Amino acid sequence: MTYRIKKWQKLSTITLLMAGVITLNGGEFRSVDKHQIAVADTNVQTPDYEKLRNTWLDVNYGYDKYDENNPDMKKKFDATEKEATNLLKEMKTESGRKYLWSGAETLETNSSHMTRTYRNIEKIAEAMRNPKTTLNTDENKKKVKDALEWLHKNAYGKEPDKKVKELSENFTKTTGKNTNLNWWDYEIGTPKSLTNTLILLNDQFSNEEKKKFTAPIKTFAPDSDKILSSVGKAELAKGGNLVDISKVKLLECIIEEDKDMMKKSIDSFNKVFTYVQDSATGKERNGFYKDGSYIDHQDVPYTGAYGVVLLEGISQMMPMIKETPFNDKTQNDTTLKSWIDDGFMPLIYKGEMMDLSRGRAISRENETSHSASATVMKSLLRLSDAMDDSTKAKYKKIVKSSVESDSSYKQNDYLNSYSDIDKMKSLMTDNSISKNGLTQQLKIYNDMDRVTYHNKDLDFAFGLSMTSKNVARYESINGENLKGWHTGAGMSYLYNSDVKHYHDNFWVTADMKRLSGTTTLDNEILKDTDDKKSSKTFVGGTKVDDQHASIGMDFENQDKTLTAKKSYFILNDKIVFLGTGIKSTDSSKNPVTTIENRKANGYTLYTDDKQTTNSDNQENNSVFLESTDTKKNIGYHFLNKPKITVKKESHTGKWKEINKSQKDTQKTDEYYEVTQKHSNSDNKYGYVLYPGLSKDVFKTKKDEVTVVKQEDDFHVVKDNESVWAGVNYSNSTQTFDINNTKVEVKAKGMFILKKKDDNTYECSFYNPESTNSASDIESKISMTGYSITNKNTSTSNESGVHFELTK
């Protein structure tokens, strides 16, 4: 059908829609699809709110996937039903009640009690939504509605403007402050449970009721990109907090069917996908860095805790956003892929998220390295459906490989929706999806002072946590992580086939003053201080490939009474530990370096090939911990025959001793502890770690590493594969020889020279205190008779300058 009209004729949008036409050239109109016109004529489509509610329910609960014949689903259903039944039974319903559940009585003066109460109602709603439940009765519906009404009048909805004033005044108090009032509960904790409940029981409430219940959110959390509004100190949210607050506002707008709020929420969420700037200070330091580091609370490496929360939040949000008219940020996928590849994957080994990235979460009994890794895998599986085909296949292989790498725990126990369980079952039974082989990977996170190394051939992973002016040695707030003193002060981690070593009560029963890799003071009295950073800036590392790295830490303890230069060299199948300049300003306390602090777990310990359990201050060339499984074996060759002390002893502890909110049940483990004492005349150490070797093979390794230089400010080692690795801690020029050819290191920095052929060395150099530019590398390092070629600078803060020395 074709129409011709005169130029003066006017056609309204409605006329066009009724006629089903659209303007073409020369004033001619042609018949087209009416819906296309509606889209073209309207700036933004109206969101399909029903579809969005269903998407949220599918991602987070998956009721339509429930199969009572699936044992994991039935287990979850029974647990959810039982908990909800008990909560309904225990709920206070009498008139004049002051609270709804015992244990959460002080709703107005303890905000966590308010959040816990709303969370209890959410748990009931979760059970009632399941079609197979026996709880979806008129009586229970009335109970839930009455409970929400009561809470609105007596807690979250009670004079919110007045409450903000009270919270703001309390927040600025220096004395007499109520520390039980937390902004998080008003802006994230409570509204998260409230909005979930209203979506779960959407058909039980009128639109007016739902809007009434969500109205306080606008007072406590008016903006989708800000936190601390409830305490009068609104600031831009970052990282996990930004995901959480934008998620709350997105759910609020779905409930209220508010398109403008939806756009703002999604715009706020999109701000998550940015990198922290190099010049950032204070809270601006929170978030992901280009080298994959994730910092929270300004100076704490937190990929394995807040980073995991962020990733899970993204996995909840992205499927929703893709169903809205505002899904136009395809670059988010690229950024997210980088975070997963560089940020998360190097920190996961055999279904375990390395504790060096979990901050104070290590002090929570039920929040383990396995549960953190399981959450990452669950998130990857969700995200795979929202990614391109190649990324989808990649993530599914990663998840399958991780789940099958450790049988000591059940991944499905950590899945909290039927759709997650269904996805996992489909993945694990899909023979077309293969597993990945073991990974050879070396990752240096210079922006959070962490290193991880995965050795493919020997099937082990090594981790290192350090401290500097930018990175705290540990975090202890809210009564958590009370003994984390040295966890970020040079502690080394060895992950092998003993998959339960760290997550099975290690942080409760280990001697926290004797952590492997650390140098501490004997009889040290440790105090909790606000600033847990070092004042040192020379901390970091460089790698030349995925097998060789040089790492250094200019070290001082918390009290600044102990200093040392501590170097760590990763050389393929071995890790070299070198220390010098170990000095205590307190003559009453001698320094001690802990070489090993390992659960005995079926190990037999040998010193110089002689079985022992205790040896006090004896000269030794080697220590070997032998297991019935060669992959679990751990060997140490000493480079200067030091006096070593070995102990085998039983340690007991309680989770409550490291986290006030945890249980006080006593736990017991046996440990082997290997230490070296220092003095003014014995102020250095040098040893080599060899994981996963038989005792006979270990013996053949005794001369593989040579100490070239072990001076106060200059460390260089050589291995028999023609690799030289070193650290220059001073600004002075230092020299060493390679086959009678002089190498000059003219500036501070970590460096590696790896022989490529008779005429060429592959090299890398990094100085954490300066800009690492390829243009002036000649002023940093040189080798007589060799010229520098093939210079390039890493695009991230990981590797420094790569170059070749060519004859």
UniProtKB/Swiss-Prot annotation:
The active site is at N241, H297, Y306. It catalyses: [hyaluronan](n) = n 3-(4-deoxy-beta-D-gluc-4-enuronosyl)-N-acetyl-D-glucosamine + H2O. Residues 1-40 form the signal peptide. Its EC number is 4.2.2.1. InterPro entries: Chondroitin_lyas, Gal_mutarotase_sf_dom, GH-type_carb-bd, Lyase_8, Lyase_8-like_C, Lyase_8_alpha_N, Lyase_8_C, Lyase_8_central_dom. PANTHER family: HYALURONATE LYASE. It is found in: Secreted. Its main location: secreted. It comes from the Bacteria. GO terms for molecular function: carbohydrate binding; hyaluronate lyase activity. GO terms for biological process: carbohydrate metabolic process. Belongs to the polysaccharide lyase 8 family. Pfam families: Lyase_8, Lyase_8_C, Lyase_8_N. This is Hyaluronate lyase. Keywords: Lyase, Secreted, Signal. It comes from Staphylococcus aureus (strain NCTC 8325 / PS 47). Gene3D superfamilies: 2.70.98.10, Chondroitin AC/alginate lyase (1.50.10.100), Polysaccharide lyase family 8-like, C-terminal (2.60.220.10). GO terms for cellular component: extracellular region. The keyword Lipid metabolism does not apply. The keyword Ligase does not apply.
